[in-house]
From Swiss-Prot:
GN (gene name): truB
Pfam families to which the protein is assigned, alphabetical: TruB_C_2, TruB_N
Keyword Lipoprotein: no
Protein's name according to its UniProt entry: tRNA pseudouridine synthase B
UniProt EC number: 5.4.99.25
Residues forming the catalytic site: 42 (nucleophile)
Catalytic activity: uridine(55) in tRNA = pseudouridine(55) in tRNA
Keyword entries, A-Z: Isomerase, tRNA processing
GO biological process, any: mRNA pseudouridine synthesis
GO MF term (any one): RNA binding
Taxonomic superkingdom: Bacteria
Transmembrane segments: none
Family recorded in the similarity comment: Belongs to the pseudouridine synthase TruB family. Type 1 subfamily.
Amino acid sequence: MNENLNGILNVYKEAGWTSFDVVAKLRGILKTKKIGHGGTLDPSVTGVLPIAVGKSTRLLEYMEAAGKIYEGQVTIGFSTETEDADGAIVNQTPVKNNLTESEIDSAMSHFVGKIKQIPPMYSAVKINGKKLYEYARAGQTIERPAREITIKSFVRTSPIDWNKEEGLVTFSFKVECSKGTYVRTLAVDLADSLGYAGHMSKLQRTASNGLLIKDAIKLSKIEEIKESGKLSTILYPAEYAVSDLPRVNLTTVQFDMARVGKKFAQSDWTNEVETADSSVNKTKQQEYLLTDLSLLTTEKFAAFYNDKLVAVYMKHPEKEGIWKPNKVLV
């Protein structure tokens, strides 16, 4: 077994694979059990699947919590039981000729911000100890509580394509969203807001944790690279797992405190801070000075020393102005 590997892989998940299938395959390729993924993709969905290897698996919770970017396609005119193109048709509402692109764009804009979303029946959300898809496969529909999600942007990226014979409208979209967002449900809710049934007909994740679709690598290629002894050339550093968190660069004194898990008071800090990159793109982030950590708007921050991730800190749940280590990595 190879237990010395450590880092993040940008895997291109192909259609037909579950996220767990990818993890299982990689365990065989890399000869290690310490592997996990940073956010489930449905089998039919393709694109970026961040994979943590070795000690980086300790950061999976931050990878899963990170925002994601997707590009896909909405079809308005009929809905399916699974809310995507794989399910059986359950409702047909032929689209009238007077539906305009401006109406669609206006409707999409109303989904931007913090919204409530009811998870679909065909999902892994648990209710009373059972996953929703287990109820759905048994022919049951049960009440699901709405969950708050954040949609940073939701825009149409193509002209609408009319199929007047079948009364269908199709168009492409791009969405940047928070953890827990069901994009297929977003497509269904968009169509419903326009007065029609609809579903998500295609989807690809294009960015996550600073990893981009253009750099994603298929499993077959990863296997080739591993066999050639060049795996280190495609392993990203652990810091990619915390790309959504503000970055605080520690002084030597603060590093000595962090490495032994000491708490910090906001008033003790004067540090260089980098803001998390909102486009989920690995670029040099803007730097500025903080006189104290109260200016941070997040509940956590990533602590770096000599350009290496050393810890993740969080606001103390009970003590105002105190930050405690959530995870120490050195």
